[in-house]
Design a protein with these regions (language model features):
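Helix-rich interaction surfaces within compact, conserved domain-sized segments
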Residues: 125-126
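N-terminal intrinsically disordered, cationic/polar leader segments
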Residues: 1-120, 131-166
């Protein structure tokens, strides 16, 4: 289950742009492409016998994001990684960079276009990374569970601290 909401923003998101600008980009942007840009994959053969004891960690980050006002386009590079460790040894490691490209409407603000691409692009490319890891680990004869889904928390209000009991 995902906590991603299809609701339009009711207030200005963080990043210095108005909710209306962001919503205009979100409702008009068209995905132009998702491309694998680079990959690094390695397995430590000494750890293969201990596969059931591997501890997995995952991560993602935005490497860059650029808006081209002339072409009305925005592009970002997202990096995803998964690492399996057996004790202190790295048993498996996969890092992949994906480029995500959107066409925006004429008049989109740079801040809104970049905010949209950073927010939405990470979810657009992640299924490709999950499939890549599944294919590579299968080809290597490794049985990993499916990578977890990622979910947006942008629309979830922050928790208020509880008062200490006296």
């Amino acid at each position: 289950m995902s906590d991603i909401s299809p609701q339009l923003a009711k207030e200005a998101p963080k990043g210095g742009f108005a909710g209306a600008d962001y919503n205009a980009v979100a409702t008009s942007a068209e995905l132009e492409g998702i491309n694998l840009l680079s990959i690094e994959f390695s397995i430590n053969p000494d750890c293969l016998l201990y596969e059931a004891q591997w501890k997995l960690s995952f991560g993602r980050k935005v490497l860059s994001c650029h808006y081209n006002e002339e072409d009305h386009s925005v592009a970002a590079i997202f990096q995803y990684h998964v690492t399996a460790k057996y004790g202190r040894k790295r048993a498996l490691h996969c890092v992949a960079d994906y480029g995500v490209f959107y066409q925006t409407h004429n008049g989109a603000t740079e801040e809104a276009a970049i905010g949209f691409c950073r927010n939405v692009g990470t979810f657009a490319a992640y299924p490709y990374f999950r499939a890549l890891v599944a294919r590579l680990t299968n080809d290597a004869g490794v049985r990993l569970p499916p990578l977890p889904i990622i979910a947006s928390t942008a629309h979830i209000p922050p928790k208020t601290p509880k008062k200490a009991k006296k």
